[in-house]
């Protein structure tokens, strides 16, 4: 390099240092006398070494051969290497997150699986299979803290729920189907919430579960509970209702409906003060099992008797707002 050739032409003087000769005294030496001469010769040899300036490499980002003349120095004027920190890139969503989002997006318009086309069903099955193959919790029953809490049903292939979802009772709507797991007391509570123009109510079943394997739990239902209707904040009667394919117009009966609203409101307040109705479930046919094939902090995929699939989202999950 051009700089090296110019550097070699610089004049360098050799410094010759003559160390003072040690004075010998009559005291006995710790070392043999022969070692004194060897030490003196070694010291003289070291004094003949040429002194050259020291250079250190500095890390730079320029294309220039030696970089910019901006060395950072300490108090002794010695240069130091400087490492430039690269700009951090934002983290991209993981593959599992993308699969979960695609799965939740595919539920749109399916009414929890009641109304789903053949193509959409095939897409959902494929996404579920991919998530199950990437399950971050291989032994869900050993991770009870993740299982613990309220899970809201987003999709199912369980035919037993379809009559409930498709009954289309006038003025009654299924608001939420959920499952609450208490891992400390080993209990499961399944709940269906209904809403109407006057009040809301729920039907709940309580069960005990027993861990049978890292993936499987055995469930035994013990009692059912019909919740006391709770009066809604506002009572609204629609102008018309579709019932059994016919549209019923309530407009001519607005006066009568208004008086009925007051009466119904008083009745609802009286009923709301009553305790819920409980009934025992002792039939052995209500025992079941549940296999959890995917589990994380947001989403759970379980399979029940007959291969039915349940996809549930944890209460508070951001996927519930998609």
From Swiss-Prot:
The keyword Transit peptide applies. Coiled coil: none annotated. Residues 67-88 are annotated as: Disordered. It is found in: Plastid, Chromoplast. Expressed in corollas. Not detected in fruits, stems, leaves, and roots. One of its GO terms (cellular component) is chromoplast. Induction: Up-regulated by gibberellins within 20 minutes after treatment and down-regulated by abscisic acid and ethylene. Residues 1-58 form a transit peptide. Transmembrane segments: none annotated. The keyword Oxidoreductase does not apply. Keywords: Chromoplast, Plastid, Transit peptide. PANTHER family: PLASTID-LIPID-ASSOCIATED PROTEIN 4, CHLOROPLASTIC-RELATED. Belongs to the PAP/fibrillin family. May be involved in carotenoid sequestration within chromoplasts. This is Chromoplast-specific carotenoid-associated protein, chromoplastic. It comes from Cucumis sativus. The gene is CHRC.
């Amino acid at each position: 390099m051009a700089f090296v050739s110019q550097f070699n032409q610089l004049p360098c003087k050799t410094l010759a240092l003559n160390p003072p000769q040690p004075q010998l005294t009559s005291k006995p030496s710790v070392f043999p006398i022969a070692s004194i001469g060897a030490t003196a010769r070694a010291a003289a040899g070291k004094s003949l070494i040429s002194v050259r300036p020291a250079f250190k490499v500095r890390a730079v980002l320029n294309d220039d051969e030696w970089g910019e003349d901006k060395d950072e120095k300490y108090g002794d004027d010695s240069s130091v290497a400087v490492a430039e920190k690269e700009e951090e890139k934002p983290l991209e969503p993981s593959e599992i997150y993308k699969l979960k989002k695609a799965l939740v997006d595919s539920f749109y318009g399916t009414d929890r699986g009641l109304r789903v086309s053949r193509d959409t069903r095939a897409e959902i099955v494929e996404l579920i299979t991919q998530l199950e193959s990437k399950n971050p919790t291989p032994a869900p029953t050993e991770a009870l803290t993740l299982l613990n809490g309220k899970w809201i049903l987003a999709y199912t292939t369980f035919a037993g729920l379809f009559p409930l979802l498709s009954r289309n009772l006038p003025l009654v709507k299924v608001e939420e189907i959920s499952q609450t797991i208490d891992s400390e007391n080993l209990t499961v509570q399944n709940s269906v919430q209904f809403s109407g123009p006057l009040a809301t109510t729920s039907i709940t079943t309580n069960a005990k579960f027993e861990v049978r394997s890292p993936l499987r739990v055995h469930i035994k239902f013990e009692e059912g509970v019909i919740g006391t209707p709770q009066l809604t904040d506002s009572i609204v009667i629609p102008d018309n209702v579709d019932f059994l394919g016919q549209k019923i117009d309530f407009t001519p009966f607005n006066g009568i409906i208004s008086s009925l609203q007051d009466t119904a409101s008083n009745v609802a307040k009286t009923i709301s003060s009553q305790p819920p109705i409980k009934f025992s479930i002792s039939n052995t046919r209500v025992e079941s099992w549940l296999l959890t094939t995917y589990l994380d902090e947001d989403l759970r995929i379980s399979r029940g008797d007959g291969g039915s699939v349940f996809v549930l989202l944890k209460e508070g999950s951001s996927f519930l707002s998609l």
